[in-house]
């Protein structure tokens, strides 16, 4: 009889604990739904930044492009040094866009927003045309931009890209 009372007492104590454990699951579901909505809004905000970036590229506005980066942001072009900070980023972009025939487009293929909502990864492809010696050359490649939320605005923290073309000289 003592064992039965003990068992019922333990069961009576555990039942409310189990029911309380169910409530966070519904709260978690609500939090996940809110996070999904926020991630969707954040993805759209980043796509807006990408669209703005493309307009600045067409206008060859290196200062405007540099402003899209975080203060401590970096651009990492192929075959060149890392440009850290707004001044170096502006200089890097100005040099690239100063190439005769420069035309660049890029398309995000995937944007992943962190569960914390303050970082995101943008992976995509680009097409580049230049004519440095009067002869048109084209390139296709891929890029990764790591975005950081600064206040309410998304800024590029790191930007790296490279060609799909084979290197010359084998």
Residue ranges and their predicted role:
Residues 1-7:
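Bacterial N-terminal signal peptides that target proteins for export
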Residues 15-17:
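C-terminal motif of bacterial Sec signal peptides marking the signal peptidase cleavage site
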Residues 19-68, 170:
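Short, low-complexity N-terminal intrinsically disordered segments enriched in polar/charged residues
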Residues 21-24, 140-165:
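Short beta-strand edge/turn micro-motifs at domain boundaries
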Residues 40-45, 62-115, 137-138:
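A solvent-exposed, acidic/Ser-Thr-rich amphipathic alpha-helical stretch
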Residues 93, 108-113, 126-128, 142-148, ...:
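Hydrophobic/aromatic beta-strand elements that line small-molecule binding cavities or substrate pockets
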Residues 113-120, 147-153:
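A short, structured loop/turn motif at beta-sheet edges
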Residues 118-128:
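A short hydrophobic beta-strand element
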């Amino acid at each position: 009889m003592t064992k039965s009372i003990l068992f019922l007492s333990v069961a009576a104590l555990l039942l409310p604990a189990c029911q309380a454990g169910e409530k966070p699951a519904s709260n978690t579901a609500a939090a996940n739904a809110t996070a999904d909505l926020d991630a969707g809004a954040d993805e759209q905000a980043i796509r807006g930044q990408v669209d703005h970036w493309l307009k600045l590229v067409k206008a060859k506005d290196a200062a405007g492009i540099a402003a899209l980066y975080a203060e401590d942001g970096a651009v990492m072009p192929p075959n060149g040094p890392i440009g850290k900070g707004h001044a170096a980023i502006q200089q890097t972009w100005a040099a690239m866009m100063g190439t005769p025939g420069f035309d660049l487009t890029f398309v995000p293929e995937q944007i992943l927003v962190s569960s914390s909502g303050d970082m995101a990864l943008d992976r995509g492809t680009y097409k580049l045309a230049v004519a440095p010696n009067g002869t048109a050359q084209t390139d296709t490649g891929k890029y990764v931009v790591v975005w950081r939320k600064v206040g309410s605005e998304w800024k590029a923290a790191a930007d790296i890209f490279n060609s799909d073309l084979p290197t010359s000289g084998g």
